[in-house]
Each structure stands twice: as C-alpha cells, then as structure tokens.
A protein has these predicted regions:
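Glycine-rich, N-terminal phosphate-binding loop of Rossmann-like dinucleotide-binding domains
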Residues: 48
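Short intrinsically disordered terminal tails
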Residues: 226-231
Length: 231
C-alpha cells in the first residue's frame, strides 16, 4: 500500500503500480484501516517532510505544528503495526540540527524508536555514493525490533555496513538496470501521459535515488538469509 497526499505523485504511483491501494493522509491511516482492507505489514518505508529540517528552510524542527512533525505519525504507525523493519529517509541536516542544540533532532528520532522497542542503524548516503552525478545528501534510518536484534545478533553484525562497502567497491551508477535507457533530459522527462514539468520538478525534489533503497532492501534480505543459514 501507498500513502501519499499530493496528487501528482499519486498519479505516478498509480501509473506504475495500478493495483496497489493508495491512502491519502498519513494522519488518518491506522492499523485498523489496513487490517480492514486485508493488508498486513512487514516493512514500513517513508520520507517524512524535510521543509523544517533542511538548511534551505527555516529549520523549525520536528515538533507539533511543523510539516516535518509528521515524523510523529510515522512513529505512531510503527508502534501500532509493529513491522519487522522500518526505513525512513530525510535530509542530512537531520543529523546536525538545530543550530542552537546540534544533534537534538536526531536524538529525538533515536529516543522515539527506542521507546517503542526498536534498534536503529543510520547512514548518511548521498546519491554520489552509487556514482550519480550529484551529491543529494540523505540520511537513511533503518529500525528493527529488539526481537530481530536478538535473533540476528545485529548489535555485533550491523545489517547495512558490509553490503554498502561491497556495493560501493563493485558497482557504479552506470551499471544499474535501465541506466542506458534514461531519456535525454534528466529533469523534464518525456511526454508519457503523466509528466508535467512544474509538478515533475517538485516531485523529483521530494524523491530519492531508487538504487539506494534497493541496496538497503538487498542488505535486509542478506541479513535474513544469514539468520536462516545459522538457525
């Protein structure tokens, strides 16, 4: 299932995954609604708004009344649904801010997740990590329940680090599937029935480089395989 409030990204999602249900507002989404619709959850992924965290914004933080304060809704869903894994993304300044109390925003993220029984790994992975032509710094936060931590010995063997070292040394952006088929324009897209220049640029600004969450997904699968082999 998807949860997306903006119309243009919803159209893009519907184009690529027409049979996947979409919900509009994370503030209204609940475990009961998902259960009613027959949806079970193993993984939650999300990028909560960055406008109040980014160095380009006013850095109002993640408190109540801010757009970035939708983090609280992400946390609520993790606590209610108890997924095996939760993966969140935001701008790198989440690690550093606010200016008057460096690190306080991220300390809250860690405290919130620990408070509902989740351990956390995090990595600052820019797009250039996989060879893209721009930096696009982002922090990726992988949370997993304490039960998984005990089963996999995660505290001694982080899920992500080994996979990241492997990928960075063996694979470049040009080698990813479909890389040779990119359109000539890397901003405005093509006349594909969906693209609208203004909305597309805004959506690209809010989007992620998909190869990075794919890499993280493979790292999770590797950890699961290792645990099964050791069992």
């Amino acid at each position: 299932a998807f949860c997306e409030i903006e119309e243009f990204p919803r159209r893009v999602l519907a184009k690529h995954w027409p049979k996947v249900p979409q919900y509009h507002d994370v503030r209204e989404l609940t475990a009961d609604i998902l259960a009613r619709d027959g949806i079970t959850v193993d993984v939650i992924t999300g990028g909560f708004p960055c406008q109040d965290i980014s160095v380009a914004g006013k850095q109002a933080g993640i408190g109540d009344g801010t757009r970035s304060g939708l983090w609280s809704e992400c946390l609520r869903l993790v606590g209610n649904l108890r997924p095996k894994y939760a993966l969140f993304e935001n701008v790198s300044n989440l690690l550093a801010g606010p200016t008057d109390q460096p690190g306080a925003w991220f300390s809250r993220i860690l405290s919130d997740l620990a408070g509902i029984g989740y351990n956390v790994e995090w990595h600052d992975l820019p797009a250039s990590f996989i060879g893209a032509w721009h930096r696009r710094g982002r922090v990726w936060i992988l949370a997993y329940s304490n039960e998984i931590s005990r089963q996999q010995g995660v505290s001694k063997r982080p899920i992500l680090r080994q996979r990241f070292v492997q990928e960075q040394s063996t694979r470049s952006f040009e080698k990813w599937p479909g890389r040779s088929n990119l359109p000539e324009s890397r901003i405005c897209g093509r006349a594909d029935g969906v693209s609208d220049v203004v909305h597309r640029i805004a959506a690209l600004g809010n989007s992620v480089v998909p190869q990075i969450p794919e890499l993280i997904g493979h790292a999770i699968l590797d950890a699961i395989k290792s645990e099964r082999a050791a069992a």
